[in-house]
Amino acid sequence: MAGDSEQALPKHSPQNGQPFLIGVSGGTASGKSSVCSKIVQLLGQNEVDHHQKQVVMLSQDSFYRILTPEQKSKALKGQFNFDHPDAFDNELILKTLKELMEGKTVQIPVYDFVTHSRKEETLVVYPADVVLFEGILAFYMQEIRDMFQMKLFVDTDADTRLSRRVLRDINERGRDLEQVLTQYITFVKPAFEEFCLPTKKYADVIIPRGADNVVAINLIVQHIQDILNGGLTKRQTNGYTNGFTSPRTRHPSDSNSSRPH
């Protein structure tokens, strides 16, 4: 398979008429959204009208809870933990994903990372054949995790993730360096180790180096195309191969545990 060639998404719908739901997890600034964007690009969906898209991408970041005045005051000082499971509106995430699986059009909140609040406008997402959902805790809640037919974990080293986060938060979110580093040490790193990293075991595919791993991403894209063509069943996706290592053996405890650790 050509490493960088774009491929057109097959016009066939999944066998059961429902979208193929893919969860993408990994630490902060690991490259989750870049991996999703690369998949969308390789499936030839970048320039497609939103009414006709067969692949859509959602971010867990859109579903941060509405903060109380006290929480918002802490957030503006960098003293609120946005990496904790309770920071997300998991009920709304679950409702949204279920509606997408039912072929419904949904409205996605738009979050303002500068003011730490939801904007008045929402993003309309139309039914699609493939739905990519990315987030640091995409696999944490079992009821959400069990909805994914494919689970990807973007595995990027801590130094790279920290440097990316510093640049992003300073350039895009108006933070200063001291605040970014304090928040990382106080909340981000401990939360990654406690809540995100343990969910890596649920991944069907682990992607070292994120979007730079062209081989792994091309394999994933081919796999998605096979599914859209009806070549593989949902059950067969559980044996899919890690980007560089051997296929995982899945144990009953993988799906029965309500918490990842």
Curated annotation (Swiss-Prot):
Residues where ATP binds: G26, G27, T28, A29, S30, G31, K32, S33, S34, D212
Pfam entry (one): PRK
Binding site for substrate: D83, Y111, H116, R165, R175, Q183
EC number per UniProt: 2.7.1.48
Polar residues: bias regions: 238-247
The protein's assembly and partners: Homotetramer.
GO MF annotation, one: ATP binding
Domain of life per record: Eukaryota
InterPro entries membership: P-loop_NTPase (IPR027417), PRK/URK (IPR006083), Uridine_kinase-like (IPR000764)
Reaction(s) this enzyme catalyzes, per UniProt: uridine + ATP = UMP + ADP + H(+); cytidine + ATP = CMP + ADP + H(+)
Keywords carried by this UniProt record: ATP-binding, Kinase, Nucleotide-binding, Transferase
Pathway: Pyrimidine metabolism; CTP biosynthesis via salvage pathway; CTP from cytidine: step 1/3; Pyrimidine metabolism; UMP biosynthesis via salvage pathway; UMP from uridine: step 1/1
Record's keyword annotation contains Cell cycle: no
Known role: Phosphorylates uridine and cytidine to uridine monophosphate and cytidine monophosphate. Does not phosphorylate deoxyribonucleosides or purine ribonucleosides. Can use ATP or GTP as a phosphate donor.
Leader sequence residues: none
Gene Ontology biological process terms, A to Z: CTP salvage; UMP salvage
CDD domains for this protein: UMPK (cd02023)
NCBIfam families: PRK05480.1, udk
Stretches the record annotates as Disordered: 1-24, 238-261
The keyword Kinase is assigned to this record: yes
Name of the protein in its database record: Uridine-cytidine kinase 2
EC class: transferase
Family: Belongs to the uridine kinase family.
